[in-house]
Amino acid sequence: DSARVFKTTDRGETWSAAVTPIPSDSMGGITSIGFIDHVRGLAVGGNVGRPHEHQENVAYTDDGGATWTQAGEPTYAGAIYGITVVPGTGIPVFVAVGPGGVDFTADLGITWSSLDTRNYWSVGFASRSAGWAVGPEGRITKISF
């Protein structure tokens, strides 16, 4: 099965579903979505039960989530737990985290580069110079672009 993204434009009165190329099963699916504007975004996820396998776990939309296309894979194997957009970079930069590390893309998910190879659970940015990734055992890592 393929993971789906649900969208509403009327505050939850009605919903539409869009199929993504990200596989979905009891151990996997979409974990996070990030948008740079109202039409362009990335959905990420994967199967947490396959931590050592590269997975088709990134999808791109350029029509507000109506359709999704397979994007490139991050440098690390396993699922992606979170994704966010770095504000104020000029060109869109997404940062993704998972048990394989922290990666970023500056071309809407086509190619990825590694920032760290340690396990992380979540990531967020207040500005291009104030981002944090968090992981097990109290790990907090500051990230700047």
Region annotations inferred by a language model:
Residues 1-145:
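Residue-level hotspots at or immediately adjacent to binding/recognition sites across diverse folds
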